[in-house]
Amino acid sequence: MFPMVTGFMNYGQQTVRAARYIGQSFMITLSHANRLPVTIQYPYEKSITSERFRGRIHFEFDKCIACEVCVRVCPIDLPVVHWRLETDIRKKRLLNYSIDFGICIFCGNCVEYCPTNCLSMTEEYELSAYNRHELNYNQIALGRLPMSVIEDYTIRTTRNSTQIKIAMDKPLNARTVTNF
């Protein structure tokens, strides 16, 4: 009879422990019920990228001295630099510069080690293309600055925080940007 009593006590302790775990899980669920949704509707909503976001590389042709430091520090030797030595002034003259973003791993080494700061990272991340050869950007394509998400007049920017609630009952006629 004594083992039966200890069996009931163990059963009771396990029941109390299970109820406590269920209660803790329910409290976590309730704490998340008040938050805004994390998912964004991509074509109409865009997240504002951080200041240190590593997007497409911007290249300034006039600043480049064709030193090829970017090629040497790139883990995959990606930037293609064509130059010619000007014998009368004993300097290199840049002829062509290109980066294939289909291969680029966006490590940022080329931007970090460039001595003249002719390379910089932009906030552009929409680089998809139907043909992989379209991802090979020359110096003209690299020189274009992308339109900032904040400056885009077709997108309405909103901040995602617990203090500011997005009104779900208002119809959205513009695209929305969410800041994380």
UniProtKB/Swiss-Prot annotation:
This is NAD(P)H-quinone oxidoreductase subunit I, chloroplastic. It comes from Calycanthus floridus var. glaucus. NDH is composed of at least 16 different subunits, 5 of which are encoded in the nucleus. GO terms for biological process: photosynthesis, light reaction. [4Fe-4S] cluster 1 binds at C64, C67, C70, C114. [4Fe-4S] cluster 2 binds at C74, C104, C107, C110. GO terms for molecular function: 4 iron, 4 sulfur cluster binding; iron ion binding; NADH dehydrogenase (ubiquinone) activity; quinone binding. The keyword Amino-acid biosynthesis does not apply. Binds 2 [4Fe-4S] clusters per subunit. NCBIfam families: ndhI, NuoI, PRK05888.1-3. Pfam families: Fer4. Residues 55-84, 95-124 form the 4Fe-4S ferredoxin-type domain. Its main location: plastid. Keywords: 4Fe-4S, Chloroplast, Iron, Iron-sulfur, Membrane, Metal-binding, NAD, NADP, Plastid, Plastoquinone, Quinone, Repeat, Thylakoid, Translocase. The lineage of its organism: Eukaryota, Viridiplantae, Streptophyta, Embryophyta, Tracheophyta. GO terms for cellular component: chloroplast thylakoid membrane. Belongs to the complex I 23 kDa subunit family. InterPro entries: 4Fe4S_Fe-S-bd (IPR017896), 4Fe4S_Fe_S_CS (IPR017900), NADH_quinone_OxRdtase_chainI (IPR010226), NDHI (IPR004497). Its EC number is 7.1.1.-. Its cofactor is [4Fe-4S] cluster. The gene is ndhI. It catalyses: a plastoquinone + NADH + (n+1) H(+)(in) = a plastoquinol + NAD(+) + n H(+)(out); a plastoquinone + NADPH + (n+1) H(+)(in) = a plastoquinol + NADP(+) + n H(+)(out). It is a peripheral membrane protein. Coiled coil: none annotated. It is found in: Plastid, Chloroplast thylakoid membrane.
